[in-house]
Structures are given as C-alpha cells and as structure tokens.
C-alpha cells in the first residue's frame, strides 16, 4: 500500500489527489492534514507555487520520515503569463527520498476586469457571485471540466517526474 500524506482538508482536492495516485500505485491510503500555506488567501504567480511547497514543509513538521511514501501540497491561484491571467491548480509532491516534482493544471483565462476583485477575495467567490453559485469552472465549461478534474490533472502532471525517476 502506498501511503500519501496530503496537506489539505479540502474534500474537493483530496479525492482527485487520491485518484491520481491510485492510477499508478493501485492501493493508496491518503491521510489528510489541515496545514496552512502561509501565502495570501488568493495567491498570485510565485505565491501559488510557494503555497504548495510551504504546505509540504509544514507537513514534514507533523509527520515523521518513514510514515509515508509521498507528501502532497496543493494550492490554487492566479498566474500571469505573457500579460494574460489564468486560474490554475498547483500540486507539489515530495517522495520519501526527498525528490520533488510540481505539476500544474490546465489554466483557464481570467478576464482582466475581474482580476482585482479576485485578488481581494477568490476566484471561487467572484465566479459564484457572477453565476449564482453554479460551480465555477464547471459552469464556465458547460459541465465539461470541474475543479476535481483540474486537481487530478495537476496531480498526474506532478507524478510524471516521480514515475520516471530514471529518465526525467
């Protein structure tokens, strides 16, 4: 059995992280911890990646080496690429041997006129206000993609380096 310690109690993130690991490792036990990211409530750019890293570092203060196979930190936020804003999920995984890998979900565009509102609250709050609590990315993609999908994609992307340690 693969033991994964996850630095979130957000149920929307736990299930897809578990599913991402199960896809490659079979039987997985995910233990969850309420660990703070130490970044702003709505992280931007490097803060998104730092939040995932910080969660792992905080988790290492709680769990002992040998009690896990992998540690997982997750954070969602905004990133600016080439002058355009995107909402993303970031997953960082650290193996027991210390090897780390970070994956990122597909990014969905955030209109410039909403960036300031989002920075002052969150993507979820702004989207829920705009679309009357209909589910954020699920609503924007006409039920094609959910936050669960984004977290699972980021998890699988982070696992690429872990799974291919000898060549990647």
Regions found by a protein language model. Give the residues of each.
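Anionic-ligand binding patches
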Residues: 42-168
């Amino acid at each position: 059995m693969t033991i994964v310690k996850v630095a979130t109690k957000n149920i929307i993130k736990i299930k897809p992280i578990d599913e991402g690991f199960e896809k490659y490792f079979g039987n997985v036990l995910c233990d969850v911890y309420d660990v703070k990211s130490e970044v702003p409530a709505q992280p931007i750019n490097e803060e998104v990646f730092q939040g995932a890293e910080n969660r792992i570092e905080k988790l290492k203060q709680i769990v002992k080496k040998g009690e896990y196979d992998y540690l997982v930190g997750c954070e969602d936020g905004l990133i600016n690429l080439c002058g355009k804003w995107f909402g993303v999920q970031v997953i960082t995984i650290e193996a027991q041997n210390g090897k780390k890998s970070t994956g990122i979900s597909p990014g969905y565009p955030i209109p410039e006129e909403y960036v300031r509102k989002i920075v002052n609250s969150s993507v979820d709050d702004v989207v829920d206000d705009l679309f009357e609590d209909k589910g954020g990315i699920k609503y924007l993609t006409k039920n094609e993609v959910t936050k669960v999908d984004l977290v699972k994609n980021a998890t699988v992307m982070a696992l690429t380096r872990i799974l291919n340690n000898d060549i990647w």
